[in-house]
Curated annotation (Swiss-Prot):
Its main location: membrane. The chain crosses the membrane at residues 11-31, 53-73, 93-113, 127-147, 160-180, 189-209, 243-263, 276-296, 314-334, 350-370, 387-407, 418-438. PANTHER family: FMN_FAD EXPORTER YEEO-RELATED, MULTIDRUG RESISTANCE PROTEIN NORM-RELATED. It comes from Escherichia coli (strain SE11). It is found in: Cell inner membrane. Keywords: Antiport, Cell inner membrane, Cell membrane, Ion transport, Membrane, Sodium, Sodium transport, Transmembrane, Transmembrane helix, Transport. GO terms for cellular component: plasma membrane. It is a multi-pass membrane protein. Multidrug efflux pump that functions probably as a Na(+)/drug antiporter. The gene is mdtK. The keyword Membrane applies. Signal peptide: none annotated. This is Multidrug resistance protein MdtK.
Length: 457
């Protein structure tokens, strides 16, 4: 029992800074929305539309680079720290190549925006302008993620938290300058949010690099002088590990976007209630997601040390802590669902629907926690392909079709509206949790030699 308590302390010490970093990132988006809304409703809508396109694109790159964390954790655990710098250099090359592709997609996103039904031309122009300003931040964001993954792979999660809050503090005044045109800068409205956010990502990257160069704990990990050439073998391995994670993230984000589109014809009350419940459950999701990042680090580190039993302990502890957290958040959600809904809106119909949907959200808290921590465990074992297959099957083959049938058809029951989609979420997330656990058990029952061989690839 003592080993589980010790492991839980280590996991929480790693996870809490990740939680705070995620809060800072979420707050940046909130600040952009509020400050753009203070300028005009059109600018706020433009930022919202632009963000809905930016997020799937940048999260694809983010997911691709998540492969670095278990690789570095495993090298650190095995005492092969001299190889870490080379992995990081190749991570920067990969981030550079991916950012070019993302920038090309975002530059041409105007075709998607202008094809939206009945969109106001002025709104479309502002959304395109916002994206074309923001896209210059894509390299900065991805380079920052490489540096952050280096730190997190070495079990240093506090730097990412600190840089997140530095970014938030810089974002507010820079937003003000470019939205309203102060200190000789042009008045750009919502487009100014894109300029500010792009600048902030570069500031965060440069601040993180400055920290890494000065950190005593990383003195033995230094990039060699001059520009290192791309190493096709290392980059291929990073892509093999990272692409399934990237695709899983992409399909997860697009799933919620598709559901939002399917709910939109149902009316203002249904859309508002759905959005409130989804926004709140997304905030609660930060807890297990951050714990999953910590579990990846611990499992990778233990496998690097050559201890499959300690890796199992880290995995089991992560799941136990995650279930405890999810139970508390579910109780919190059920107890205060109406008060929470009132923070967003005071329309009685909207509050009633949102509170009802939050009950369904509370039902899947534990499943959601298990599936996301299970994903973190599999990343630690470098078993990333199964993450994609499980996620795609659970969300797109089981969750979305069942949600659609319940919400919009009378094949099973009378059309349930948004609640049908939320039952679909429960089906999808529970299926994902079961499949993640089955895959984890399969891996852990393999001979230790095979587990360590797979982890050292």
């Amino acid at each position: 029992m003592q080993k589980y308590i010790s492991e839980a302390r280590l996991l929480l010490a790693l996870a809490i800074p990740v939680i705070l970093a995620q809060i800072a990132q979420t707050a940046m988006g909130f600040v952009d929305t509020v400050m753009a809304g203070g300028y005009s409703a059109t600018d706020m809508a433009a930022v919202a539309i632009g963000t809905s396109i930016w997020l799937p694109a940048i999260l694809f790159g983010h997911g691709l680079l998540l492969a670095l964390t278990p690789v570095i954790a495993q090298l650190n655990g095995s005492g092969r720290r001299e190889r870490i710098a080379h992995q990081v250099r190749q991570g920067f090359w990969l981030a550079g190549f991916v950012s070019v592709l993302i920038m090309l997609v975002l530059w041409n996103a105007g075709y998607i925006i202008r094809s939206m039904e009945n969109i106001d031309p002025a709104l479309a122009d502002k959304a395109v302008g916002y994206l074309r300003a923001l896209l210059w931040g894509a390299p900065g964001y991805l380079f920052f993620q490489v540096a952050r993954n280096q730190c997190e792979g070495l079990a240093k999660t506090k730097p990412g938290m600190v840089m997140g809050f530095i970014g938030l503090l810089v974002n507010i005044p820079v937003n003000y300058i470019f939205i309203y045109g102060h200190f000789g800068m042009p008045e750009l409205g919502g487009v100014g949010c894109g300029v500010a956010t792009a600048a902030v990502y570069w500031v965060m990257f440069l601040a993180m690099v400055s920290y890494i160069k000065r950190a005593r704990s990383m003195r033995d990990i230094r990039n060699e002088k001059g520009t290192a050439k791309p190493d096709p073998a290392v980059m291929k391995r990073l892509i093999q590990l990272g692409l399934p994670i990237a695709l899983a993230l992409f399909f997860e984000v697009t799933l919620f976007a598709v559901v939002a589109l399917l709910v939109s014809p149902l009316g203002i009350v249904d859309v508002a209630g759905h959005q409130i419940a989804l926004n709140f459950s997304s905030l609660m999701f930060v807890l297990p997601m951050s714990l999953a990042a910590a579990v990846t680090i611990r499992v990778g580190y233990r496998l690097g040390q050559g201890s499959t039993l300690d890796a199992q302990t880290a995995a089991r502890t992560g799941l136990m802590v995650g279930v405890c957290m999810a139970t508390l958040t579910a109780i919190f959600t059920v107890s205060l669902r109406e008060q929470i809904a009132l923070l967003y809106n005071d329309n009685p119909e909207v509050v009633t629907l949102a509170a009802h949907l939050m009950l369904l959200a509370a039902v899947y808290q534990i499943s959601d926690s298990i599936q996301v921590i299970g994903s973190g465990i599999l990343r630690g074992y470098k078993d990333t392909r199964s993450i994609f297959y499980i996620t795609f099957t659970a969300y797109w083959v089981l969750g979305l079709p069942s949600g659609y049938i319940l919400a919009l058809t009378d094949l099973v029951v009378k059309p349930m509206g948004p609640a049908g989609f939320w039952i679909g979420f429960i089906i999808g997330l529970t299926s994902a949790a079961i499949m993640m656990m089955l895959r984890m058990r399969f891996l852990q029952r393999l001979p230790s030699v095979i587990i360590l061989q797979r982890a050292s690839r």
